[in-house]
Amino acid sequence: MLCERLIICGDSFSEGMSDQVINGKYRGWADRVADVMAQANPDFTYVNLAVRGKLVQQVIADQVPQAEKFITGKKTLVTFHAGANDALRPNYNPELVLPLYSDAVRKLAATGVTLMLFTVLERTGNAGKAADLWAARFHAFNENVRAVAQEVGAIVADANEESFFNDRRFLAFDRLHLNPMGHDRVAQAVLEKLELPSNPNWRKPLPPTRKTPWLRSKVNNVAWFLTFALPWLWRRARGKSSGDGRIAKYPEPISWPIN
């Protein structure tokens, strides 16, 4: 696909957490895709409206209207991914979130844009009651993504089709966001879906590794809880989000790559 403009809507996944930081911004899979698109088109422009922590209603209210202003036709690719943060909340209501998601997809598709959606990885190698609960929620969410994508003719990037993504080594230390290896794999999957140059070995699993010793595993669990889980719970208790006060990293069309 020869793309004239790439517009990204979403949350931390699309912002690029927790990839390498360049000029104060996470790189992420979307920047990597933009790199390849720019090589094929000197007039290519890029917009990334995604902000970490945003819920589906916030993405729809804040980002979709902005995206619509920048759509120029079929050669504009919009990626839309929202709702995973909702599903992580204790008060998650799928009867509210899923219709909101579907309506936003229909609204974007009606502009004539090329549209790409994403499923949520249902299993990331984590275990326990919380992991089981989230897997069930994400499964229902993904079924909705696939259904509305088929309805409007959107492209779907489905991580659950690739078993290697269950390897926790693609996750950052927070056990939630992708690390640089994970973002690179997502970028290659997106590029392949768009029939653009990609690494043909992107599906190759990581080599086997030794099991983490019991004591080190326990220390890692405590460090994770204190560093990530506890602050996350504290923000929820206060009604705060990691995205509060943040702005999109590229809120208007820019030539890419940045010189």
Label the predicted regions.
Residues 1-52, 64-74:
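Serine-esterase "nucleophile elbow" of acetyl-processing enzymes
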Residues 2, 151, 174-177, 181-259:
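Conserved catalytic region of serine esterases and O-acyltransferases that act on ester linkages
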Residues 15-17, 56-96, 122-123:
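Oxyanion-hole/transition-state-stabilizing segment in secreted/luminal serine hydrolases
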Residues 19-24, 92-95, 130-135, 172-173:
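Short glycine-enriched, charge-decorated loop/helix-capping segments at active-site entrances
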Residues 48-50, 119-120, 158-161:
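Residue-level recognition of beta-strand->loop/alpha-helix junctions
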Residues 78-81, 108-109, 115-117:
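Conserved, well-ordered alpha-helix/loop/beta-strand core segments that scaffold catalytic motifs
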Residues 94-102, 134-141:
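Charged helix-capping and loop-helix junction motifs
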Residues 125-159, 180:
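Substrate-gating cap/lid alpha-helix
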